[in-house]
């Protein structure tokens, strides 16, 4: 009889572990057709990692993720992805500011250093998150584009805990038409972002 009770106790514990999610198995959320998940990873010398996962269009080249000037002490430095024609599409500089307790995104001191200045700044809500969106001009003579097509970027700043991150998305517009980007696509990309530390 005692053996039966012990077996029941063991099975009960196993069932509780299974239903409480205490297993090594992780469900992978598959992106919609035409989309893919990529990871930007910043690593410190001590082995700590920051990962920004994001869902992006499939025509972007998953194997092209590049690093520029990454700081091995602060989880910062530019990581970006190109499309399959080698044109920069989007990226992040990792952690760009740290908020004090009680501060919000509006209080963040962000040293953006845009070479051509900022065309506009506004705060927008997408889902449950608030973003600061800086609209900037990148240049007026993009490689491989007609001379009247300029390159712009929307730089989105957002908070996770007390950390401020950025995520930028490039797009093209005819001369000064800075509002020519695909609004739903950019919102979808932003909504998919997740941050993890390991």
Residue map of PLM features:
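Residues that flank catalytic or metal-binding motifs in active/ligand-binding sites
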Residues: 56, 92, 153-154, 189
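Short, flexible beta-strand-to-coil junctions
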Residues: 84-85, 98-103, 137-141, 160-161, ...
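Short, solvent-exposed loop/turn segments that connect beta-strands within catalytic domains
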Residues: 45-48, 70, 85-89, 142-149
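Sec-dependent bacterial lipoprotein signal peptides
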Residues: 1-20
């Amino acid at each position: 009889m005692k053996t039966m009770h012990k077996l029941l106790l063991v099975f009960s514990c196993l069932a509780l572990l299974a239903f409480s999610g205490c297993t090594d198995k992780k469900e992978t959320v598959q992106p919609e057709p035409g989309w893919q998940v990529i990871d930007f990873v910043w690593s410190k010398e001590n082995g700590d990692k920051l990962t920004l996962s994001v869902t992006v269009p499939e025509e972007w080249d998953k194997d092209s993720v590049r690093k520029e000037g990454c700081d091995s002490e602060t989880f910062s430095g530019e990581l970006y992805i190109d499309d399959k024609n080698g044109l920069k599409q989007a990226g992040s500089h990792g952690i760009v500011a740290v908020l004090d307790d009680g501060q919000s995104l509006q209080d963040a001191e962000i040293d953006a250093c845009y070479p051509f200045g900022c065309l506009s700044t506004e705060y927008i809500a997408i889902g449950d998150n608030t973003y600061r969106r800086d609209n900037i001009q990148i240049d007026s003579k993009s490689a491989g584009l007609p001379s009247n097509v300029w390159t712009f970027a929307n730089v989105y700043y957002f908070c996770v805990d007390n950390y401020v991150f950025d995520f930028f998305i490039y797009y093209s517009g005819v001369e000064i038409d800075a509002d020519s980007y695909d609004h739903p696509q950019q919102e979808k990309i932003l909504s998919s972002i997740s941050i993890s530390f390991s």
